[in-house]
């Protein structure tokens, strides 16, 4: 098949395989014009030229009344999917932050202790109010602990999990304790036990 430069009207001999089904970018070797050439199934074949041209015409410029030459076939432009790359980078960044938080948690919150747990009714028969004492046995200030409560049935299966970030401004000074409460609605009727633990943000994400 042959193609024509839109700028200088110079014709070039190419093969269908060089252009491809989806087309590709080409560059005129005469005027250096760039354009996107699509495959035209209606173009004349090489055998339709009055002066038959052999396959060497693909490599060597040919001078005839068609003024045929050889174009510069540019490499296919790679398509980069930006959104998946950015999304993956965001997920990796969040995981790194959570892992850093986990390491801080291991060395910081292991001195907290939950004591004096009491349970009462909350609003209606399906609700529960949990009162507990949170003690800081360390020599430093601890802020914003995350408390996770699991509701368990008689077979020790977890029926639900509830988290309390203790009002986001909780401060527990060294060797001191505070009293907190957590309200839970719609407790399953098959609930038998509750489990109260101290967790970090990574634990909340994969709970």
Swiss-Prot record:
Keyword set, alphabetical order: Membrane, Transmembrane, Transmembrane helix
Gene Ontology cellular component list: membrane
Membrane-spanning parts: 82-102
Entry's localization field: Membrane
Pfam families per record: Zn_ribbon_4
UniProt topology in membrane: Single-pass membrane protein
Principal place of residence: membrane
Protein name, per record: Uncharacterized protein RP193
Organism encoding this protein: Rickettsia prowazekii (strain Madrid E)
